[in-house]
């Protein structure tokens, strides 16, 4: 799984599953066309729309130094009716 890091399970993403929309975090350097092609090829589904937004990294303190976690991109993938993606594993914390 090159482009997709992990699935996102929030209240909104669970609500969107009823509309056949799947939410996941992807690598920040990935483009929409790369992710669309990868999802269609790997899962054998038909993607009709993709929405994405970039989320900023969070501030983290490491001793006296303030740092940041990496920025990441979140994609909401809409599939044609009749197609579905099996649940992706949840990221372990």
Swiss-Prot record:
Gene3D superfamilies reported in the protein's UniProt record: 3.30.70.330
Subcellular location: Plastid, Chloroplast
Molecular functions per Gene Ontology: mRNA binding; rRNA binding; structural constituent of ribosome
Cellular-component GO terms for this entry: chloroplast; ribonucleoprotein complex; ribosome
Superkingdom of origin: Eukaryota
Principal location: plastid
GO terms classed as biological process: translation
Coiled coil: none
Keyword flag Cell membrane: no
Function text: Binds to 23S rRNA.
Subunit structure: Part of the 50S ribosomal subunit.
HAMAP family on file: Ribosomal_uL23_B (MF_01369_B)
Family under the similarity heading: Belongs to the universal ribosomal protein uL23 family.
Record protein name field: Large ribosomal subunit protein uL23cz/uL23cy
Organism: Helianthus annuus (Common sunflower)
Lineage, highest ranks first: Eukaryota, Viridiplantae, Streptophyta, Embryophyta, Tracheophyta
